[in-house]
């Protein structure tokens, strides 16, 4: 059954056929000719028959065991796979389609399109291997640049870095999906850019809901989606982020576009790596994680960066197991993050959207050398006022606001106005709220919050600050409310 190389693989490379000698769940051992052993990370194909139907499984070579044996991890369930069947080396790693044709479509980790209509075919610009090197040091963008989103709370208090990685924290129902859709819309409108969404090990229902909501809001045509959900084998969940990142790299490097890459959830990437590591028989490291945790995370994160002119900016939803921030999985992720955006239920309960916690969110570029002295000073003052308001909450709850000093009463009034002015209508929610989304330039945001902090708008009613855009919008609403009052 073990045969020498006869078939032509990609780019004319000779490929070999072998036979399956052992199957243990998603782990498959195969024997190949000594002179035609497949390389590490090469994709292997096996035809299996199950319930009267035929399908082709894709495996990825993970280890060379000696005695002409390789150990591979399956990217699909191995039901129907038996010893002795032929296995073919494709001669290259897993490849995925790239280019404009992937927009509006859903793919799995091995590049198969999952939402083609009957009779519809996909004609991609090219196919790229998912295992790629990070950009060379000489090609990286030397300057640190802020990604202006037009969302006041983010731009002022936790600004994003072009080509940076942002951690997105938040439970169910606090507006995470809306924020994701909003960023996709803004990148397309403001930069003419593209978004790629990687669903890594999350619920199939959530993935389906996201597709439906994106279709309804019209952003699906600007987005490519790659899914490896929690019912998939660990090999798929480990590779789906790389498949999505490869599509994003094509938009950045070939089409010279700004790209937004969403990974939901980066913890599941680590979790899948732990499962694969155990299946391969490696000795576990701290808390049972794989010994290669930092290496695997680095290989993914270092490819997400700015090259000269264009950038892949990544928003990564992060699940923190048992809220333990010292757990190796989130701790390893934090080392790569440039900013964090915390979505807080107590803020969404007030009807303030985006429900970003201004005190818990942070950014490494919120410093004078990156954003300028005025931006830094205004942001610091806004945080100081909000922190003082938070400190006074218990006193207000027990004794009432009348018991505060005159200075503290002023701070509470300004904090409540700031809190409401941090809310903003979004493009993604236009069809639900009936109110048009707004983009506020960073200069206007800084000017507005400076005036609020200094008390210039203390005479404006609090309601005027709620869900408005820039200064013009605020002053118009205030005049209307004061005229009514």
Swiss-Prot record:
Transmembrane segments: none annotated. It is a peripheral membrane protein. SMART domains: AAA (SM00382). Disulfide bonds: none annotated. Produces ATP from ADP in the presence of a proton gradient across the membrane. The catalytic sites are hosted primarily by the beta subunits. F-type ATPases have 2 components, CF(1) - the catalytic core - and CF(0) - the membrane proton channel. CF(1) has five subunits: alpha(3), beta(3), gamma(1), delta(1), epsilon(1). CF(0) has three main subunits: a(1), b(2) and c(9-12). The alpha and beta chains form an alternating ring which encloses part of the gamma chain. CF(1) is attached to CF(0) by a central stalk formed by the gamma and epsilon chains, while a peripheral stalk is formed by the delta and b chains. This is ATP synthase subunit beta.
């Amino acid at each position: 059954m073990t045969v020498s190389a006869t078939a032509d693989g990609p780019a004319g490379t000779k490929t070999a056929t072998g036979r399956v000698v052992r199957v243990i769940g998603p782990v498959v051992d195969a024997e190949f000719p000594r002179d035609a052993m497949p390389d590490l990370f090469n994709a292997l194909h096996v035809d299996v028959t199950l319930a009267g139907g035929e399908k082709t499984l894709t495996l990825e070579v993970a280890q060379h065991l000696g005695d002409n044996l390789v150990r591979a991890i399956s990217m699909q369930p191995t039901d129907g796979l038996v010893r002795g069947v032929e296995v073919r080396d494709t001669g290259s790693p897993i490849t995925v389609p790239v280019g404009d044709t992937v927009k509006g479509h859903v793919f799995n980790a091995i590049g198969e399109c999952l939402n083609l209509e009957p009779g519809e075919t996909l004609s991609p610009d090219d196919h790229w291997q998912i295992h790629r090197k990070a950009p060379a040091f000489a090609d990286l963008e030397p300057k640190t640049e802020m990604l202006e989103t037009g969302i006041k709370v983010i731009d002022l208090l936790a600004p994003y870095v072009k080509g940076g990685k942002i951690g997105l924290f938040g439970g169910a129902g606090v507006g995470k999906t809306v924020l994701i859709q909003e960023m996709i819309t803004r990148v397309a409108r403001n930069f003419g850019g593209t978004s790629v969404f990687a669903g890594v090990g999350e619920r199939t229902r959530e993935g389906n809901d996201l597709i439906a909501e994106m279709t309804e809001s019209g952003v699906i045509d600007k987005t490519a989606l790659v899914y490896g959900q929690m019912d998939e084998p660990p090999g798929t969940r480990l590779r789906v982020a790389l498949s999505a990142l490869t599509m994003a790299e094509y938009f950045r490097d070939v089409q010279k576009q700004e790209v937004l890459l969403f990974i939901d959830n980066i913890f599941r990437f680590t979790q899948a790596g732990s499962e694969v590591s155990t299946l391969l028989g490696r000795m576990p490291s701290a808390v049972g994680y794989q010994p290669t945790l930092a290496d695997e995370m680095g290989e993914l994160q270092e490819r997400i960066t700015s090259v000269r002119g264009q950038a892949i900016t990544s928003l990564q939803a992060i699940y923190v197991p048992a809220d333990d921030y010292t757990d190796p999985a989130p701790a390893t992720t934090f080392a790569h993050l440039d900013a964090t955006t915390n979505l807080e239920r107590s803020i969404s309960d007030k009807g303030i959207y985006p429900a970003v916690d201004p005190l818990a969110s942070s950014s490494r570029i919120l410093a004078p050398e990156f954003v300028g002295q005025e931006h830094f000073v205004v942001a610091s003052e806004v945080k100081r006022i909000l922190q003082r308001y938070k400190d006074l909450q218990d006193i207000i709850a027990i004794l009432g606001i009348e018991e505060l000093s005159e200075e503290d009463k002023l701070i509470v009034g300004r904090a409540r106005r700031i809190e409401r002015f941090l809310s903003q209508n979004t493009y993604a929610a236009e069809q639900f709220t009936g109110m048009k989304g707004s983009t506020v330039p960073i200069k206007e945001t800084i000017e507005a919050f400076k005036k609020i902090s200094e008390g210039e708008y203390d005479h404006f009613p609090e309601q005027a600050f709620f869900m408005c855009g820039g200064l013009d919008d605020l002053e118009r609403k205030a005049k209307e409310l004061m005229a009514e009052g």
